[in-house]
């Protein structure tokens, strides 16, 4: 198996699901590959998913038949081939085309191979001049129907103006975002902020490593070196600064019992353990696989317990700090969660909001009098953030101690250190009158609700 053939197969499966793309594990498929080939497969698959809508639109402009009538395996090959031609400058065109054609002939027939050859060579002809990031057309790509923007701030000039005429649809296609998400953003934050968010979604999310002393740095080495670096000290972790900031809101508290209700793979659990070393911490997650990872990660940590969902009986009414990092639309972390770029719609948002409310209602009986709740999402949507917190305050007679809505930062071509995810977090209590501002080790310029860029924050 070659790295390309593995990606072809994986994208074929995804093409049946689109826009409901799955988060697939690499599993056994890439184990036989060496590090270089694994890195290539990873870059090709993630790059294709991140620009799926853009690539599909360009491919459709070269077709005489409906995209939906093409065999899923061939759709996967075409997407991967177009991604190499347009997104991976180091890959020669002939390498991208030849393996796509040969794999298709083996998988299907010579006719299908000829079809793939013709379409990918049309993509090569469609790709024109490459613009420097300082070129005005590259900087204002959304104004032009013939500009294909790239993650480094550069852009391709296409030989035909194939992007849609309508500006909002064009923005979604060029930035590879769903129409419903673009329209929702325009309706809530306006056109200018939507443009900035869309441009941010073209950038590559860096890997941020939190060192044992709490400092945060962008990792620039290989994945193998990163794995070794993390194994050397289990206090190191991968975490974006915005994600780390939410737990830092609890820094001035002295909780005896903490529950991390939706712990995922334990990123915030690790941070809670570091910030509150004397607390008893109970962590859970409804997903069996993630819960197994939690058991492995905290196997030798005495004051962290991994429990089954809803098995918190012995701490009912005794929890001092409840952490609710709830499932959400992921709209603040789309460069990291490319699968979420296309599935946003009003009905899904309503479903997520309902799920979040269910989680809140199920978990709040754990709290003792005067306890605190940390509510966090990686979403930009007010329905999942500010409106949920408003509902919590009314429904449970709670008060907001601090809240923060954070816009994502970092544009294509910017230094990786400027990048931050977007998100929201709020610390609430039913007994906030007992709290004073100086009880919290927070930034002095932080307001109760802000949209500031946490560029200089440390996790």
Ranges and model annotations:
Residues 254-262:
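Conserved class I S-adenosyl-L-methionine
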Residues 284-316:
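S-adenosyl-L-methionine
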Residues 309-323, 327-329, 350, 369-459:
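C-terminal catalytic and target-recognition region of SAM-dependent MTase-like enzymes
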Residues 276, 325-361, 379-383:
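Mobile active-site "lid"/loop adjacent to the S-adenosyl-L-methionine
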Residues 278-282:
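Short beta-strand element of Class I
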Residues 1-231:
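Class I Rossmann-like S-adenosyl-L-methionine
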Residues 276, 367-369:
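Helix-to-beta-strand junctions that scaffold the AdoMet/dcAdoMet cofactor pocket
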